Amino acid sequence: MIKLRLKRFGKKKEASFRIVACNSTSRRDGRPLQELGFYNPRTKETRLDTEALRTRLTQGAQPTDVVRTLLEKGGLLEKIERPSIAIGKAKLEKEKKAKAKTKEEENEGSKTESGSNEAES
């Protein structure tokens, strides 16, 4: 599978990144199939080769999370709302509590039904 990811270069503590297309099993700084752009996190500078990126995306290349946000900012991908981890945990807890309540109500309902059936017999 082809991934669109960041390849690190630059001095120590002054990293810059190239946006590259590479095989998903290759190393982070290994030889890429194609260089598609540039990103400097210190100056927030981003350069994208839009034509090459579009062709790679249509071929089925999967961007990593960071590259996806860069492409969304560049207008190449539609923005997808991704819930934060904290919101997801809170939702799960609410769902668990709701399921527990429904199970308790079902258990109480089945007990009353079985009791009324025995009384009728």
UniProtKB/Swiss-Prot annotation:
Polar residues: bias regions: 112-121
PROSITE patterns noted in UniProt: RIBOSOMAL_S16 (PS00732)
Compositionally biased region (Basic and acidic residues): 90-111
GO molecular function, one term: structural constituent of ribosome
Keyword Ribosomal protein applies: yes
Annotated stretches, region: Disordered: 88-121
InterPro entries, per database record: Ribosomal_bS16, Ribosomal_bS16_CS, Ribosomal_bS16_dom_sf
Gene Ontology cellular component list: cytoplasm; small ribosomal subunit
Keywords of the record: Ribonucleoprotein, Ribosomal protein
GO terms under biological process: translation
Keyword RNA-binding in annotation: no
HAMAP family recorded: Ribosomal_bS16 (MF_00385)
Family: Belongs to the bacterial ribosomal protein bS16 family.
Name of the featured protein: Small ribosomal subunit protein bS16
